[in-house]
Amino acid sequence: MSYIKNANIQGNAWVAQGACVVGNVTLGDESSVWYNAVVRGDMAPIIVGCGSNIQDGTVVHADAGFPCKIGNGTTIGHNAIIHGCTIGHNTVVGMGAIVMNGAEIGSDCIIGAGSLVTQGTVVPDGMLAFGSPAKVIRPLTEAEKKENQTNGISYMLMKNIQKD
């Protein structure tokens, strides 16, 4: 069973069994929080945009003074740690990546799997960044930006299958 306490779950958002969503958390319409993920807004607000997905085993948390905002259509890969940061629309944060307090990741970005985005790092719109610490590598191609959107849409569809 999922655990939801004091969260604002909007429209057709979905929280999987075993996931935990607590505190000052808003899940936008069509967003999803997958198995064993934790979204914990006990110290500062967390907003997950419409159609975004928080995949299995991920932790999203916010510290006092560092709220967390995830844009629309964004994918947070399995076992990522998202902590007190801002992530734009249609961005993919790869599996196992860590994004720290005060980091700002733009829209239409990819953060490579296993990357560490350190506190206060800024990744501009449309960029690929990876490494530990993560560095901007190059602009995304239009095909990569489209794939980000396709990924988000596929998770919206999978969410609807899981709910049935």
PLM features per residue range, with description:
Residues 1-9, 42-50, 56-58, 62-63, ...:
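Glycine-rich hexapeptide-repeat left-handed beta-helix
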Residues 6, 11-47, 61-65:
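N-terminal first-folded block
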